[in-house]
């Protein structure tokens, strides 16, 4: 599957807020909405939109169905958030999206060699999405916000497609 990828624009893509149903809010922690999350990280010290922080929206059949926010930090890519449109959940699209994202340098301009993501232990559906995309459970991360599960993806290929 080749999705169409576009840069997230908070002014024209407010419809993404509607994807945050109660289930999504509880499993992502986006209590204040996606736009607030995006604007926080886009202005966070050390992050430069388009340089080491990106947010992309994936389209299928000319309709947006997923958004992914990620950054580059210490020689690895960190997925900060993935949100799939509610009616598209449970169909394997999240895993397919991640595989395409990880293996297509054209989406962000470079090949991802190592990628990490943290996930709430209660978010079993998301854990399966990442595992099906090739991520491996690595360790429990403990901090003041509670436990999270760290998953790691490492590219097995050095191609630059």
Please give the residue ranges for each predicted region.
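Conserved GNAT acetyl-CoA-binding A-motif
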Residues: 105-119
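Conserved active-site alpha-helix within GNAT-family acetyltransferase domains
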Residues: 95, 121-139
